[in-house]
Design a protein with these regions (language model features):
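Catalytic cores of alpha/beta
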Residues: 148-155, 211-225, 281-292
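Canonical Radical SAM [4Fe-4S] cluster-binding loop centered on the CxxxCxxC motif
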Residues: 52-93
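Conserved, mostly hydrophobic/aromatic
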Residues: 17, 44, 72, 111, ...
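Auxiliary Fe-S-binding modules of radical SAM enzymes
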Residues: 1-35, 102, 226-352
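Core AdoMet radical
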Residues: 79-94, 101-122, 128, 132-192, ...
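Short, charged low-complexity linear segments at domain edges
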Residues: 36-57, 295
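Short, small-residue-enriched loops and turns at beta-alpha junctions
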Residues: 65-66, 115-120, 181, 209-214, ...
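Generic structural signal for well-ordered alpha-helices
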Residues: 60, 98, 125-129, 152, ...
Length: 352
């Protein structure tokens, strides 16, 4: 049996049993047989089509604060980065973003920010309930970090539907390489279990190519995803940011990110899987290639243009100067060019 035949057989096995062994993962990530890699992407794309057809769900991203109390080593808005130009959006500004987004057809708003103590539970609940009152046909997703179960419950009661919290790595040692000592993988995981128990549609995820990542740590990530059964998984390449301790670390690659997107689609066929902005940052057609590898969500930016460039988790981020309407229609045309249709809907998880 040639290597090509062996790998194709492995891809078919993973597709059939929705699981992957360490040896299979190792083989799929290490192979330089691009014919086999194309087959992996093709199978993942077919699997996404089975559930979602040629539809791509579009979410409006609102980055409402770049203050953060944490000091994660990879992140440009880390607490100790004195070069970050800090900002906060008022409730009125956030509502204005939603208003323009709603007019453009967005039916999911993703409120993302650093862990900023200024936004108390009361403030977050007020923002969420305000959006839900004005746009009852829209979903609200929060991505604001680690909170207590009580806090998560209060946001849910205010109307939040989904919560994104990347676990970043399921390996303890790797987690401590990426985060300060006061943060723990155990707490991060507990937050995800709490969110799921409350009733959110939950998203976890990780950076591809972060310092210290290995096939072993990636295998733990896939096992954790299998265990958690999240509704969404957000992965994108690690891209260094010049004002962080990882400034000189090399970035993750598009190739490895696409392979992992495809693998995640095969082991978790109905998952909502974004083709991220970071993927579009490392390659001009990164997001298109992500969709062709099994992803089915894109998240154009609805934040005011004057703050876009300040939300610098990593360097060279794309689309920071474009108006929301430009981003929306640019994305629609990009998806159309590869045979996909951007859908105006909440875009829930298939079985939710």
């Amino acid at each position: 049996m040639t290597e090509n035949t062996a790998i194709i057989k492995i891809i078919d096995e993973i597709t059939a049993c929705r699981n992957i062994t360490f040896e299979q993962l190792h083989m799929l990530l290490e192979t330089d047989d691009m014919q086999a890699v194309d087959y992996l992407r093709k199978r993942a794309s077919e699997k996404a089509h089975e559930t979602y057809g040629n539809q791509v769900f579009i979410r409006g991203l609102i980055e409402f604060t770049n203050y953060c109390k944490n000091d994660c080593l990879y992140c440009g808005i880390r607490h100790s980065n004195t070069h970050a130009d800090r900002y906060r959006l008022s409730t009125e500004q956030i509502m204005a973003c939603c208003e323009s987004g709603y007019e453009l057809g967005f039916r999911t708003f993703v409120l993302q920010g650093g862990e900023d103590p200024y936004y108390t539970d009361e403030r977050i609940c007020e923002i969420v309930s305000g959006i839900k009152a004005k746009y009852p046909d829209c979903a609200v997703t929060l991505s604001i970090g680690e909170k207590s179960k009580e806090s998560y419950q209060s946001y849910f009661d205010a109307g939040a539907d989904r919560y994104l919290l990347r676990h970043e790595t399921a390996d303890e040692k790797h987690y401590s390489r990426l985060h300060p000592a006061e943060m723990s993988l155990a707490n991060r995981k507990q937050c995800l279990w709490d969110l799921k128990e409350i009733g959110y549609q939950v998203g976890c995820g990780f950076m591809v190519g972060s310092p210290g990542q290995t096939v072993e740590t990636l295998y733990k990530d896939l096992q954790f995803i299998k265990e958690l059964e999240p509704h969404m998984v957000g992965i994108g390449p690690f891209i260094s940011q010049k004002d962080t301790p990882f400034a000189n670390e090399k970035s993750g690659t598009m190739d490895e990110t696409l392979r992992l997107l495809s693998i995640i689609r095969l082991i978790h066929p109905k998952v909502l899987l974004p083709a991220t902005t970071a993927l579009g940052t490392i390659h001009p057609l990164g997001r298109e290639k992500g969709i062709q590898s099994g992803a089915n969500v894109v998240m154009p930016n609805l934040s005011p243009v004057n703050v876009r460039d300040k939300y610098k988790l990593y360097d060279n981020k794309i689309c920071t100067g474009d108006e929301a309407a430009e981003c929306r229609f640019c994305m629609e045309n990009r998806m159309k060019s590869i045979g996909y249709q951007v859908v105006v809907s909440c875009g829930d998880y298939a079985d939710f």
